[in-house]
Amino acid sequence: MADLEKIRAAENDPARHEHAVRVTQEINRRLDLASMNALANQARAAKSPKAKVILLQKAADKFGEAAKGLVPCRKGCSHCCHMATMIHLDEAKAIAAATGAKMVTPKAFNVDLQYVDKIRARYDGVACRFLVNGACSIYAQRPLACRIHVVVDVDNTLCEIVPGQKIRLPMIDTREFDWAISMAWGGPLEMKYADIREFFPPKPDKTK
């Protein structure tokens, strides 16, 4: 059970805030923007969805490379695997092709804020279908959202999901890259996004 009092104290800890600023500055200093932007532009020009996904994955990985050794994210911490995670239709197809997992195509796609809020309410706290024994079973094919999920905190205290509670989690700012991803897919009108659990529903619990 999450210790909400401890979490709220951590949210307001000045030392944590200062740490987040320092780490963010160092990640931005390390970030290979030229390479990342070149890959994003190649993805935008790519003709096949598969090629777009591969190029965007390589671009997104630049965040993880820049953050190496600076952040609490590591194998065994699966808090973010219990968060709502929006992925593009082409990412879902790539995951299905690489893993053999059966994919369900949502009846409709939507990215407005009300939809995203509903998705968060529905899936925050629900384990990703591909979380196995506390680790991602499709790590090489994990979504872009997972690749750019970089927590700039001292530890993972603020990563814990608390139902009904909004927790301020210090993250690297990826808005510029998010826009590059949007344009690679064809712009806002082609944003065929849904939560990963919409494409790959969690397996039923046979113990119930």
Give the ranges of each region predicted by the language model.
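Short loop/turn segments that flank or connect secondary-structure elements
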Residues: 1-79, 83-135, 139-208
